[in-house]
């Protein structure tokens, strides 16, 4: 399978299918530092990135904002001193789509 970070997001409409349990099991193995959270009944991907200070955390946040705009898919971002919590899910389907896994992998690439 092509690396997730090399894929592009596809337009996701409200009737797009959520990932199946089988797809979830396969895709989550490709982004091992991410966890699955359920908030208000909505499955989401989440990872906490740690940094040495606020300035580095903010620089990462800004790079992530640029990436989100390029792909037109936007995460939840919580930036604080020394860490950034990133949450991906597809708002239109209230759950996880392959796009979320692609963006999680691309987010990890921002550290390289």
UniProtKB/Swiss-Prot annotation:
Keyword entries, A-Z: Lyase
In short, the EC number is 4.2.1.96
Pfam families annotated for this entry? Pterin_4a
One GO-annotated biological process of the protein: tetrahydrobiopterin biosynthetic process
Q: Its catalytic activity?
A: (4aS,6R)-4a-hydroxy-L-erythro-5,6,7,8-tetrahydrobiopterin = (6R)-L-erythro-6,7-dihydrobiopterin + H2O
Q: Which GO terms describe its molecular function?
A: 4-alpha-hydroxytetrahydrobiopterin dehydratase activity
Question: Is Lyase found in the keyword set?
Answer: yes
Q: Does the keyword Lyase apply?
A: yes
Q: Could you say which protein family the record assigns here?
A: Belongs to the pterin-4-alpha-carbinolamine dehydratase family.
User: What is this protein called in UniProt?
Assistant: Putative pterin-4-alpha-carbinolamine dehydratase
Q: Which organism is it from?
A: Shewanella baltica (strain OS185)
